[in-house]
């Protein structure tokens, strides 16, 4: 396998490969660190991926880079088989100002906006398809393009009747749970959890693996509270630039529901309780 991969990459890079090292840690794509005489690059393979996943990632990285707000790996080359990215050496421990710097950078990213929510192409959230058809109404967009597709997949995967009853309550309340959401369509990373944040070897924040679209900035912020959360310094720095809006606690749960449903669909019924708890909090408020 490595000999064939080496040959294919040498043809794409048009230079001999000195080292080819597998990179662990990703749960979706196979990845390699590739060193030539001129550069070291990070290569993702299309093996095992759905069609269009690498292209969607490349487009998301391009969009984030356009904002100039936060560092992402530079896209060097995209082919049918490979996504070749800038290799960014990572530090083990973040410097003391890392989280506050990330908070400010995310707030600046969210200042980069367009008129309506959505994106010019569909993409993926993990391995799940993510619809991005633009609509002028954010609440409608989040229901039709975020919650409903995930819910329909969850039903197909056998989500229990107890969860269905809670979903029916949410349906009857909609769109009230997103009352007070921002009308500004901010540029969002889309999958901003701690596993998609790196510390470069010079201490700079780097974000990877985006699921980019434009929408309420709180959608990005809400995910940061799940799966371990971010440092308090991150939130303090973020809110110094973008103050927290009234009603965030309920909207936060709505935005988290999207990701919890996605985890149910990707990883199975161990996420049932988390989905039900989130639905319960939304519908009780």
Where in the sequence are the language-model features?
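An alpha-helical support segment within catalytic cores of ATP-dependent transferases
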Residues: 1-11, 114-187, 200, 281
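Short helix/strand-capping connector loops at secondary-structure junctions
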Residues: 254-263
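Active-site Asp-x-Gly
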Residues: 131-143, 152, 181-187, 194, ...
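Activation segment
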Residues: 48, 90, 148, 205, ...
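ATP-binding pocket architecture of kinase catalytic cores
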Residues: 21-140
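Protein kinase-like catalytic domain
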Residues: 65, 110-113, 242, 265, ...
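Conserved N-terminal boundary motif of the eukaryotic protein kinase catalytic domain
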Residues: 14-21
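ATP/Mg2+ or Mg2+-diphosphate-binding catalytic cores
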Residues: 263-285
């Amino acid at each position: 396998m490595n000999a064939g991969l080496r040959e294919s990459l040498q043809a794409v890079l048009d230079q001999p490969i000195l080292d080819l090292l597998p990179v662990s840690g990703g749960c979706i794509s196979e990845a390699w660190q590739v060193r030539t005489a001129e550069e070291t690059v990070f290569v993702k393979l299309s093996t095992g991926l759905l069609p269009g996943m690498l292209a969607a990632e490349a487009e998301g990285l391009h969009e984030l880079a356009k904002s100039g707000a936060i560092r992402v790996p530079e896209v060097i080359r995209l082919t049918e088989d490979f996504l070749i990215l800038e290799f960014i050496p990572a530090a083990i421990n973040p410097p003391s100002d890392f989280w506050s710097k990330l908070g400010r950078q995310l707030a600046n990213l969210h200042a980069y906006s367009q008129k309506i929510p959505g994106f010019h192409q569909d993409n993926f959230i993990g391995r799940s398809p993510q619809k991005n058809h633009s609509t002028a109404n954010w609440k409608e967009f989040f229901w039709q393009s975020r919650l409903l597709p995930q819910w329909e997949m969850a039903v197909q995967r056998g989500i229990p009747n107890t969860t269905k009853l809670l979903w029916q309550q949410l349906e009857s309340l909609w769109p009230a749970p997103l009352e007070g959401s921002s009308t500004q369509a901010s540029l969002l990373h889309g999958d901003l959890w701690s596993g998609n944040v790196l510390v470069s070897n010079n201490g700079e924040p780097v974000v990877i693996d985006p699921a980019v679209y434009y929408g309420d900035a709180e959608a990005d912020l809400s995910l940061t509270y799940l799966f371990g959360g971010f440092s308090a310094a991150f939130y303090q720095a973020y809110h110094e630039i973008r103050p927290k809006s009234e009603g965030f606690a309920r909207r936060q749960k709505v935005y988290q529901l999207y990701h919890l449903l996605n985890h149910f669909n990707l990883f199975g019924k161990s996420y049932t309780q988390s989905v039900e708890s989130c639905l319960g909090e939304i519908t009780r408020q």
